[in-house]
Curated annotation (Swiss-Prot):
This is Histidinol-phosphate aminotransferase. CDD domains: AAT_like. One of its GO terms (molecular function) is histidinol-phosphate transaminase activity. Its EC number is 2.6.1.9. It is an enzyme of class 2 (transferase). Belongs to the class-II pyridoxal-phosphate-dependent aminotransferase family. Histidinol-phosphate aminotransferase subfamily. Pathway: Amino-acid biosynthesis; L-histidine biosynthesis; L-histidine from 5-phospho-alpha-D-ribose 1-diphosphate: step 7/9. InterPro entries: Aminotransferase_I/II_large (IPR004839), HisP_aminotrans (IPR005861), HistidinolP_aminotransfase (IPR050106), PyrdxlP-dep_Trfase (IPR015424), PyrdxlP-dep_Trfase_major (IPR015421), PyrdxlP-dep_Trfase_small (IPR015422). Keywords: Amino-acid biosynthesis, Aminotransferase, Histidine biosynthesis, Pyridoxal phosphate, Transferase. The modification N6-(pyridoxal phosphate)lysine is found at K218. It catalyses: L-histidinol phosphate + 2-oxoglutarate = 3-(imidazol-4-yl)-2-oxopropyl phosphate + L-glutamate.
Amino acid sequence: MTQITPQPGIMDIALYEGGASKVDGLDTVIKLSSNENPLGPSPAAIAAYKAAAGELHRYPSTDHAGLRGAIAEVYGLDPERIICGAGSDEIIAFLCQAYVGPGDEVIHTEHGFAMYRISTLAAGGTPVEVPERERVTDVDAILAGVTDRTRLVFIANPNNPTGTMIGGNALARLADGLPEGCLLVLDGAYAEYVPDYDAGKALVESRENVVMTRTFSKIYGLGALRVGWGYGPRHVIDVLNRVRGPFNLSTGALAAAEAAVRDRAYTETCRAENAKWRGWLASELAALGIPSDTSSANFVLARFASPEEAGACDDFLKARGIIVRRVSGYKLPAALRMTVGDAEGCRALVDAVAAFKAQAA
């Protein structure tokens, strides 16, 4: 037997399963499983990516100054307190790598994003799951779960896969209730879908224990390029830059992301279209007897009567070329997460769910 063994915790990591993209036997599908922007990226981002092709022989920027400057301008932030990564996943990994080790604990909520647990285990730490209250983050449960070994607390707000969120006062109470030496990480992957929401800016700028993360994979439609960023206290960003590789983002990704964030009109179009069809989708599902919590993201968590009904509906949809997401791995076996698609995709989804309910009656 081999004596080559991984570090403790590594083999406790379940392989991440992304949303399916294909259905065997079908050439065309409607993919509503990965919370992607159905409108795609800004035309300006596509043009910038193409233009970057002439520089493929050059190493990319090491400090991401152009992208950090654009983010700072659009969001009203200090560019020196921004760090960029290959998706917000990498920022999450940096945080665990830098602040978590054997014996340390990291808190995440019951239905929180899977990468919190994965990155914690990869760093040798212990993930601690705390309950939610009816699929909503419970600040009191988090504070009750904190020990002298807690180093990070991850909150997705809005949360994936539930779509629920808590307000600024609750977040401030959480930040103030954490002990010294513990960072609160606000994952704002879906924050751009919430009007007039800073996703943590005020908390970051008024406290030394709060970091916020964002992604270009959702409203900006750049999931294939893997770009994310974080904003935090100077001392935290300095630490994260010490573990960040010097060329972690490609020239094309940097160019496309900068163009995307500057195209505010296109972003607003995407936000408005999502709000319109998200409301329509939730209403139509409710009329079919399928409830969902109020979503602040670009998906709806459809709740069925049982895991069996959810599974049967998933199979029914797949047979018709519509792919949604089972979320049993998030301890929601009786639910399906349905990305808000374009008009055609949403109508096709509702028609198929209606047909499923009719044949099951």
